[in-house]
């Protein structure tokens, strides 16, 4: 009997995309649904996203944003190294921090950093950045098969699910293990499209199938909300165009070029 798992990450306060994703998942009715963390950042009114997730009782991991907000830290702990990336990240963090109530902080503080499942005999590890570090970026172009295999063996899993980079990808390893970056639903995937993506995995007795589902939502309504909240115009432009305008210095060249090629193709 097949078992399906839906997973998404990087909500980034995009409550309209979250609502659309949850509706799509609800129609498909997988046996398991997980959010891999990062409630806030980038978008408007983070409490709206918190209310949606808590009302559904959806299991969620603690991302770097959730840890920082929950524990009253001064920045998002995103792991950026470029000053421009960090400057925009700080604007986003300060807004989120100022618009989250104590009940939500307590909830975020209590979230687990990782989770383990066994689905049709496959050991599944869910985390935010990587099993090693909550804010580690696992980029497709920078992760060799050997490294990903080591990561799975070292952390005792057959299927590894992560997020944090904002770009979705899947690697089927020669040994039969799988690594899946589920991407983010809080902003588009830097491909000139305004939809967002989540991952759906199907576990059969002898195989694992991995797919990504695009979800449309009212991105223009979100852009107007962001403008009303006086969030940076650069953030709003990303929602309206499907192209990232901030935190790009952290993205490897191959990811930038591949996304450009997909949009042009």
Task: Give the predicted meaning of each segment.
Residues 8-9, 33-38, 59-64, 127, ...:
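Active-site neighborhood of phospho(di)ester-bond hydrolases with catalytic His/Asp-centered motifs
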Residues 49, 56-117, 138, 142-156:
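Active-site neighborhood of divalent metal-dependent phosphoester bond hydrolases
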Residues 1-6, 117-125, 174-178, 205-209:
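Beta-strand-turn-beta hairpins that frame and shape the catalytic cleft
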